[in-house]
Amino acid sequence: MQKLQIFVYIYLFMLLVAGPVDLNENSEQKENVEKKGLCNACLWRQSNKSSRLEAIKIQILSKLRLETAPNISKDAIRQLLPKAPPLRELIDQYDVQRDDSSDGSLEDDDYHVTTETVITMPTESDLLAEVQEKPKCCFFKFSSKIQHNKVVKAQLWIYLRPVKTPTTVFVQILRLIKPMKDGTRYTGIRSLKLDMNPGTGIWQSIDVKTVLQNWLKQPESNLGIEIKALDENGHDLAVTFPEPGEEGLNPFLEVKVTDTPKRSRRDFGLDCDEHSTESRCCRYPLTVDFEAFGWDWIIAPKRYKANYCSGECEFLFLQKYPHTHLVHQANPKGSAGPCCTPTKMSPINMLYFNGKEQIIYGKIPGMVVDRCGCS
C-alpha cells in the first residue's frame, strides 16, 4: 500500500511539472507546418523569379549576338530615330507579344533572333577615297543579318522639304561607280516624277531591292549613292544632311528579310497567380521592364510578360513521362528527380539599336513561357 501511495505522489508531481495539457497542440503544430510550407513555397517562387529575370537579360544579349548592352544615351536615341512612316508604324502597331497560348502548341525554335526588318542609317565609307569627289549622299553598310538572309523587300526612304507653291519634283537616285574612261561616275538606279502641294514635307520611298542584291553579291561595287529631288526652279528638296530642326529626317534603308516557319506539337500545363497555393509545377506571371534595367537601346517593347515556372514535380503527377517514373522506381536514390521547366515558349518582336547604331526589328525566339511541365 505504501508503494502505491509513493507511485501516485510521483505521478502527480510529474503532472504539475509538465503543466496543463493543450488538446489543440497537435492541430496547432500541423498548422505551423503548413504555414512554414507555404512560406517556403513563396521563397522558392521568389528565387525562381529572380533567376528568370537574370536569365532573360543574358538570353537577350546572347540571342542578339551582343557581348554587352549597346551604350546609347536617350539624347542620342532621340537624334537617331528617324521620323519616318515605317518606323512609326512599327511602334504604333507594335505587337509586343503573342499570348495566344490556349492552343497548347510547343514551338521548336531556333536560338537566335529571326530578323524581319532592318532599318539602316547612312554612314561614312573609306571606299569613297577611291574617287575624286564624294557624293552628296549616301553610303550604307549592311550587317550579317542582311547578308545571310534572303532579301524580300528593300526601300530607300527620303524626306522632301515642304514647298510654298504647287510644283513638280523630279527625283533621281544615282549609284556611284569607279570613274570610267569617259569620266562617268554615276549610273541610274531609279527616277520618278511627283507633284507636291504647299504644306508639310513628305516621305517618299523608292524600291532598291535589285541594287541591294547586287551590292550583297559584289560588296566592292557598293561605293554609295546620290539623291536628287529638283523642283521646277532647280531647288533640291531632298534632305541628305539634315540642317538644324531637321533631326530624324535622314535618308535610310528599310530592308525586309525572310522568316523561318516553325514546327509545333501539342502540350498542356497549369496556370497560377502569385497568391496561389498550388504546389505542383505551374506557370506564374512575370513582367520584364527594360527601363528598370536601364536598357534605353530597346525602342519597343519597353516591357513584356515573360512568365516563369515554379513548383514541385512529384512522381504522382508524371503519367506524362512514364520512362522517368520507371527509372525512378528501379533506382529511386540514383535517379535525378524531374524539374519544373518551360514546355512551350513563344517569341517576342523587338525594335532595338544594335552596336552599330542600326535600328533592327526582329523576332526573338523563346522569350515568353506559355506552358510549364515536369521533365
From Swiss-Prot:
Q: Tell me the GO molecular function terms.
A: cytokine activity; growth factor activity; heparin binding; identical protein binding
Query: Which SMART domains would you find in this protein's record?
Result: TGFB
Q: Which residues form a coiled coil?
A: none
Q: Which UniProt keywords apply?
A: Cleavage on pair of basic residues, Cytokine, Disulfide bond, Glycoprotein, Growth factor, Heparin-binding, Secreted, Signal
* Entry-linked SUPFAM superfamilies: Cystine-knot cytokines
Q: Name its cellular compartments.
A: Secreted
Q: Which GO terms describe its biological process?
A: myoblast migration involved in skeletal muscle regeneration; positive regulation of lamellipodium assembly; positive regulation of macrophage chemotaxis
Answer yes or no on keyword Nucleotidyltransferase: no
- Family, similarity comment: Belongs to the TGF-beta family.
Job description of the protein:
Acts specifically as a negative regulator of skeletal muscle growth.
Task: Name the chain's protein.
Answer: Growth/differentiation factor 8
Q: State the organism of origin.
A: Capra ibex (Ibex)
